[in-house]
Amino acid sequence: MLFRSPHMSDSASFDEVAELLYMHGRSLPHSILMMIPEAWERALDMESTKRDFYRFHATLMEAWDGPASVSFCDGLRVGAVLDRNGLRPARYWVTKDRRVIFSSEVGVLDIDPSQVAYKGRLQPGRMFLVDLEQGEIVDDGALKESLSRQAPYGEWIRAEQSDLDDLPTTTMLVPEHESILQIGRAHV
C-alpha cells in the first residue's frame, strides 16, 4: 500500500512516512529508527533484544538506505540520524553553556573555541538526540536499549515468523487446459 503523495521528492516521502508512524503512536526516535536502522543483520555482537527490535521492524518496512543525514524534531526532542553507510557529513559541537550546534559542516556559527565543551561526528547508524524537556543529550545506546525493551519483539518473532525452508512442501497441481478455459469463461 502506498502511504505517500504522488510526484513528491524522496525527502517529502520520507517526511510523510515518518509522520504517519509518529501520528499512529510511535515516538519520533522509534519511527526514525524503523526507517533508518543501523546495520544489524551481520552485527554478531549486537545485544539480542536490539537485534529483535530491528528484525521485527524489518518485517514491517524496508530500510531507507541513504546516503542520508536526517534531522527531526517533535517539539520535545530534536535529533539526527545518519544512515548505515555513513556517506554524509554530520558534526556537532556542545558548548559549555549547553548549546548544541549540529551541521554538515564545521564553522557554520562563529563560536569561541574556548567555549566548546566537546565535539563529535555522528557515526553510521547512530542517533544524536537532545531531550529538550530534560535538557540533556540522550545516549544512543541507552535510547536503543529502552526502545528495544518496550515490547517483546523476540517473542513475537519466534511465535509468528516462519522461514520459507521450514514450510511444508506441497505438490503443485496443474489444472487441465479445459478447466482453465471454463473458469476464465465463468468470470467474463
Q: Over which residues does each language-model region extend?
A:
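Conserved short alpha-helical segments that host acidic/polar catalytic motifs at enzyme active sites
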Residues: F3-R185
